């Protein structure tokens, strides 16, 4: 099968590389996730040899845990990257879906740093059990406004507020609100 063995329009030597699998069909997605992780691992290894720090950002990480093999590869990378001069940041709006995977649960529980924003009731219940979050702390991620949440660093969990005024250039650059095309 040589579906992925063709020239690409992505310059993998750029400082920032985006691998967008949004339109990948369901049949090819498990393989595409593994291929993407392999490409990311190769880049981390190359940068390590050159003494460069790498920051890997995975959005919608729950997709990796829908498939056993990509979830396992991601878990190994999660454990290894820090040793190789890389940080791995994962984001998902679908926490409950992630936590169906035992591998994802291990990653959440063993992560030194977590930012939690507004969560649905079922997500809060799962996170509370897994991370030992009190009811008082959970109130900070219940119907929370944008920029409000909980920060877990090591064994400490603290509420935070990090709002950006709407009339600033930073807000225009950072907003993720659908329909706000401010830039």
Question: Which residues are covered by each model-predicted region?
Answer:
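H-loop/switch region of ABC-family ATPase nucleotide-binding domains
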Residues: 92
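P-loop NTPase motor core of the ASCE superfamily
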Residues: 96-183
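P-loop NTPase motor domains
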Residues: 1-86, 99-102, 140-144, 149-155
